[in-house]
């Protein structure tokens, strides 16, 4: 019975300490006075970035092909 009380007391103490540290960290973030903007990481943003990168690659190859044909160096 004593060991069970001892372990529960230790568990409660460690939980209280970790909760206190989390609250201090949260309060420190709020004290900055500025709103931090979270980066949106959704599947639509990922697809948009992928399409943008693919579009740049295709455009670059088209420009290279057109300049090659116009200059006659192909």
UniProtKB/Swiss-Prot annotation:
InterPro entries tied to this protein: Antimicrobial_frog_2, Frog_antimicrobial_propeptide
GTP-binding found in the keyword field: no
GO BP: defense response to bacterium
Tissue specificity note: Expressed by the skin glands.
Keywords, in A-Z order: Amphibian defense peptide, Antibiotic, Antimicrobial, Cleavage on pair of basic residues, Disulfide bond, Secreted, Signal
Main location: secreted
GO cellular component, one term: extracellular region
Location(s), subcellular: Secreted
Disulfide-bond pairs as recorded: 68-74
Domain of life: Eukaryota
Signal peptide span: 1-22
Pro-peptide positions on chain: 23-41
Described function: Antimicrobial peptide.
Family: Belongs to the frog skin active peptide (FSAP) family. Brevinin subfamily.
Protein name (record): Brevinin-2Ta
Native organism: Rana temporaria (European common frog)
Lineage of source species: Eukaryota, Metazoa, Chordata, Craniata, Vertebrata
């Amino acid at each position: 019975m004593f060991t069970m009380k001892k372990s529960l007391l230790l568990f409660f103490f460690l939980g209280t300490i970790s909760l206190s540290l989390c609250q201090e960290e949260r309060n420190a973030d709020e004290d900055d006075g500025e709103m931090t903007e979270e980066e949106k990481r959704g599947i639509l943003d990922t697809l948009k970035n992928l399409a943008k990168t693919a579009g740049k690659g295709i455009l670059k190859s088209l420009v290279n092909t057109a300049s090659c044909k116009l200059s006659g160096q192909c």
